[in-house]
């Protein structure tokens, strides 16, 4: 092993010489102080170029401890700098402003980050605004198309419903199926009287097991058919429609 490395290892074992060197930085110059005398360390860092690289590679911890050596091993300029400027000249009062200053910038960026977050959200909203507008326009267009289709369907349904009552009324007329006996009696009555009085209509309805409305509708249809065939207009002896006179004289049974 190299003598310098072995001396460094031996110097780490007894801590007293190291502390003596630290507390007596000018021991190299005068050699006398008020502290008890300690034997000088057998090594010096003025021989740094002669220190082999193998020792530093083999013992990195010891080489680092040796590099952080006593002040007397440093050059003269570093001695002067350390004497004029202590190593730790900071006072406890100086730490508080620094901590406050550190806290303030930390709090500042936090608030700024919040503001930036809100502003970024605002920017996102503003940038997303046109997209939302386009989406709203598209939804309104779809709604208008749906409404127009609904209106068309409703109009077609209304037309169908309008056509349905006519068809239903025709179906009702067709569903009114008279028997042969009923038709014979109605034809005989129509041959004698084209218009029926209310009383006579009631009697025929009771005799034929029909309603007065069915009898009235049958006579109306029969008169229309007779008018189309003959082309003439029948006139009652009194010059008015007996059914109309009966309807004005008495309330309708419908």
Curated annotation (Swiss-Prot):
Natural source organism: Pan paniscus (Pygmy chimpanzee)
Coiled-coil parts of chain: none
One cellular component (GO) term of this entry: nucleus
Residues in the DNA-binding region annotation: 171-230
Lineage of producing organism: Eukaryota, Metazoa, Chordata, Craniata, Vertebrata
SMART domains reported in the protein's UniProt record: HOX (SM00389)
Protein name per Swiss-Prot or TrEMBL: Homeobox protein MOX-1
Compositional bias per record (Basic and acidic residues), positions renumbered to this chain: 154-178
Subcellular location: Nucleus; Cytoplasm
Superkingdom field: Eukaryota
GO BP terms: hematopoietic stem cell differentiation; sclerotome development; somite development; somite specification
Function according to Swiss-Prot or TrEMBL: Mesodermal transcription factor that plays a key role in somitogenesis and is specifically required for sclerotome development. Required for maintenance of the sclerotome polarity and formation of the cranio-cervical joints. Binds specifically to the promoter of target genes and regulates their expression. Activates expression of NKX3-2 in the sclerotome. Activates expression of CDKN1A and CDKN2A in endothelial cells, acting as a regulator of vascular cell proliferation. While it activates CDKN1A in a DNA-dependent manner, it activates CDKN2A in a DNA-independent manner.
InterPro entries registered for this protein in UniProt: HD (IPR001356), HD_metazoa (IPR020479), Homeobox_CS (IPR017970), Homeodomain-like_sf (IPR009057), MOX-1/MOX-2 (IPR042634)
UniProt keyword annotations, A-Z: Activator, Cytoplasm, Developmental protein, DNA-binding, Homeobox, Nucleus, Repressor, Transcription, Transcription regulation
